[in-house]
Amino acid sequence: MAKDYSEDLLIQKSTAELLEQELGWKSVYAFDNEVLGEQGTLGRKTQSEVVLTRHLRMALKRLNPWMTDKQLTEAIERMTSYMSSQTLMQINEEKYGYLRDGVPVTRLKPNGETEQVRARVMDFANVDNNEFIAVRELWIKGPIHKRRTDVVCFVNGIPLIFIELKNHDQDIQNAYTDNYRDYLDTIPHLFHHNAMIMLSNGMESRVGTVGSKWEFFHEWKRLTELDHGNIELPTMLRGICKKENLLDLLENFILFDHSGGSTVKILARNHQYLGVNQAVEMYRHREEMKGKLGVFWHTQGSGKSYSMVFLARKIRRKFEGSPTIVVLTDRDELNKQISDTFENCGLLGGLKAKQFIAHSGDDLRQ
């Protein structure tokens, strides 16, 4: 069958059309159309570049009008550079911190001394102040090999989402084992800033993160709690790539868990995202909803500890004041598990979990 009409390309084309026509992304077909150079299609000088620095520079200037050209260059250098001794997970966690909390740049104080300040890379408060571009068939050159990706989604020039698509009749696990794993080996720098990986054959879809094994890629099949489950690709795209949802996921629903001496990147599952956001809305209206805030119920093994972390972190980040969060358990083992999760996911500010465990009423009052 001719390339222009192959089934996987039709899935790819329909993906780009949904992103562009329904969700408001700009769509670019780069396969044999990309013009390299600063004034080219995407502003890439070479196929090795994975950050669209032209678009990143414009975003930094738009979000931080105070930045000088020197500071813009410094910020871009921090966003794109890494040490060869770093693992992919270490790089990814570092870049995620810049995306979420701002990239450090040097600023001169009136007294002549310098200080480090954070420049925003994303505008989480105003969705329309960000630029969303979905690029199909983008050639990326690694140290040895070159690969052509199906769809890469950029926000402010940063490649946040990698989408691998297969034919309807193929098992989507092949997208993981045959394609994604190969890209990790051949063009690993594409995943330095990656927030999430989507794998689909159109009829079935899963999403995961850098470092996730196949069994930890999950379906995203509901847009609201009342929806019937639908595992097809359009549901996942609408649930994750809607601009407001993507920025919310990026800001509030990604964790790096340092338990057990290793680091695991956690993206909220569909039910956690919906449930936590419902709980956040209840907290927002807590005064008028006193006595009927509701219960966020979990089955065993569905991630209740992470849901607590997501909820606590979003409330602390999005609301004024310093809310006190009390976690009650009915077993010492569960008490330790949840407190360790809070510590290992960075919610305790570097302090040890045991400092926050209350053993009596007096402890709790303190």
Language-model segments: what does each one mean?
Residues 330:
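Conserved H-loop
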Residues 343-366:
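Inter-Walker segment of RecA-like/P-loop motor cores
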Residues 2-324, 333-349:
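ATP-dependent helicase/translocase motor core
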